A protein has these predicted regions:
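Catalytic palm active-site di-aspartate
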Residues: 1-6
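Flexible, active-site-proximal loop/turn residues at the rims of small-molecule/cofactor binding pockets
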Residues: 9
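C-terminal, non-catalytic extensions of nucleic-acid polymerases
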Residues: 12-218
Length: 218
């Protein structure tokens, strides 16, 4: 395990002296890394930028590992990869979310995947000419948030229903992707993705402000 410490420049030598004493007492060895920046949402979700330029992302920010489909994290959800990628670009490179979305034309980054288990099934619901149309879907579906589309609802045989995306947002099912289809034809609702990106940015910045206030008390 490990911990992060914020050390004044004039206390660095004292810090290393204390570490050496601890190693002698415990017969254990400490390892040290230096960050140029540490962006923390909470203890399980953070981004670290090392002084050598390398980065480390944990929890919901592990977009790079998810994108590469590393075996160790196949259990994690790859939904809406554009969100953690944009948050990462904002904090590590200063790229505004609007600019990031403008250059990300990979449809897979805007997709989410959901699965219905047990007695649950998916329904696609839309209204055309004042008539409700219901389409039964398969157990595993992929979709993105679109300007025009349907509401995707997970339904249980006991009558319970859960919207895949609550509120005003519409979805388009995309279980198969046409590699020849231009990205501009997907009708992606970028307002949804911007909202999600800014929610995470604001959450992190609030944590950062709170941490700075707490540190100032000492």
């Amino acid at each position: 395990d490990g911990l992060e410490t914020l050390i004044p420049n004039d206390k660095v030598d004292k810090y290393h002296e204390i570490c050496r004493k601890w190693e002698i007492m415990t017969q254990l060895n400490l390892e040290h890394d230096e960050y140029s920046k540490l962006i923390i949402a909470d203890v399980n979700n953070y981004m670290a930028v090392y002084k050598n330029g390398k980065t480390k992302c944990k929890g919901k920010f592990e977009w790079e590992e998810l994108e590469k489909k590393k075996v160790s994290i196949l259990h994690k959800n790859k939904s809406f990869l554009v969100v953690p990628k944009a948050v990462y670009a904002y904090f590590t490179k200063g790229v505004m979310p609007e600019d990031f979305l403008a250059q990300d034309n990979n449809i897979f980054n805007y997709c989410a995947g959901v699965k219905a288990k047990g007695g649950w099934v998916f329904e696609e619901r839309s209204v055309k000419d004042s008539t409700l149309h219901v389409n039964k879907l398969q157990k595993i579906i992929r979709y993105f948030i679109s300007n025009k589309g349907s509401k995707l609802v997970k339904c249980n045989k006991d009558g319970r229903e859960i919207q895949t995306e609550a509120g005003q947002w519409l979805q388009t099912v995309i279980n198969k992707v046409d590699p020849n289809k231009p990205f501009t034809e997907y009708d992606i609702n970028k307002s949804y993705y911007l909202d999600e990106i800014y929610k995470q940015i604001q959450q992190i910045e609030k944590v950062s402000q709170r941490s700075s206030t707490q540190l100032s008390l000492f």
